[in-house]
Structures are given as C-alpha cells and as structure tokens.
Amino acid sequence: MLHAYTPPHRFLPYLSWTDIAALPDKANTVIVLPVGAIEQHGPHLPCAVDAIITAGVMGQALAALPAEVPAFGMPALVYGKSDEHIHFPGTLLVDGVTLLNTMIALGESVYRAGFRKWLIVNSHGGQPQVMEMAARELRIRHGDFTVLPHFVWRVSNVAGSFMTERERRLSMHAGHAETAILMALAPDTVHMERAVANYPPEFPKSLSTDGRPAAAWTARDFGDSGVIGDPFPATPAQGQAILDSLVASWVEGITDLHHLQWPARDEAPPRLA
C-alpha cells in the first residue's frame, strides 16, 4: 500500500480534502516528508536503500507518536539528485534544479493547505543543500512557515557504537550502518554473499580533519563496487538497535517541533534585484 511503513491514520493522502480542511490547529500540526533516492548501493544492497531508510524510520516514528501530537506523513519522495552514482545501472535521478523546484512546489502545497510546520527528512547525502535552498526560499516567501530540512541520521542514535574508528571516519555509502538497518527494515533485499569492503583514499588532515574526501567525487572514483565502507560486521540485531534509536529520537523531534514556536514575520519579502 502507498502508506508503506506509516500507519494509515497518520498518512495525509488517506484523508479527504474536507477532512484536511477541518483539521484543528493546523498551524502546529507537523507534516513529514521523507526524501530518499534510488541509486546503487553496491552489489549486496538494493538501489532503494535511501528511500527504504527514510520511509521506514519516519513511518515508525509516526506510528510511535503519542496520540495527542498532531502529525501526518506525506508519501516519500524517492527520486533524488544522485549524479555521483550515475555510472552504475539502477541509479534513477533528477537534476538539482528539478529537485529544488519540486521541493518548493510541494512546500507551497503544504502551506496552501493551511499547515505551517513542514519537516523534511532526507536520507541521501548528495542533496542536503537542495533541501536547505528550498526551505530558505519558502521561508522568504512565507514568514510564518517553519520549514525544517533535516537528515535522517543526524539525530541521536547508536550506529557509531558498533563501528570501527575507520568506519566512523570514512564510510559514506553501503557500509556498516546502512547494511545493518536494511537487515532490520528489508532483510530479503540484503545479500551478504555479494558484499565487498572498500574505502576511499584519505584526504590530507590540513584539508579534512577526519580524512574524509573533501574534493568533489563520484562513487566510481573509488572503485568498481560502488561501496564506500565495510558492510561485513553488520548484523540484524545491530540494525534493529540502530532503527529503534533513530525512531525514538525522531518521536522526540516531531513532538518538539509540534510545540516549537518559531519567530514569524508578516511583512512582504523584499524584491530581489
């Protein structure tokens, strides 16, 4: 079904337009948009990794919310700016301008429906800047619109406790954490018999304190597998622990956003030259 991991009663498109029009306190109702990508994740994981993670985490967070916290999920936006993986079959992408315009149009739709709190939870590392640009544009247009562009992993979670020091520093794609959480969310899509480990070359400390590549890159630059990290230590139990910790943090985050009273302005935005 379209709602995937989100419970039907928390899924915005399952309401009629009259239901949405009649919702109380829409100014403090949190609308959640999971944003992912369809792109290669090595030979052992499906191309839908990012879409699965953001839909799974946020869907389960919405399911775990206290009943008194008003929040609804939108269908996940599964296509993203994935051109760093363009050399691999299965990567289905849109360009940055298309994604930016799509995000702005969706935000305008959320605002037009009367909602004033929009949480964008992205899981693909190649597009946070696009989410931020869309959020800023919407805020310029609407001074009472609280738009929060976020990253699904950038809340308190236990993933790092399972990783080696090298994995924490250099893993970026299809490594330990993503493999483990897929074992919990979609175990039938994980094929560890095909897994490989692969790390990028370390960057000079003067330009990157943790050694992570600071220059522009594509996944093909680091080898033929598409993997950037070590998936081998991942286990289903670790994946469930990571998932549970992310869900708990996002329940807290959605609740706090519901209560947040962000500054608002009512003047028209100035015209840009």
Regions found by a protein language model. Name each.
Residues 120:
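Conserved SAM-binding loop
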Residues 1-117, 125-273:
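Extended, histidine- and acidic-residue-enriched regions that form the cofactor-binding/catalytic faces
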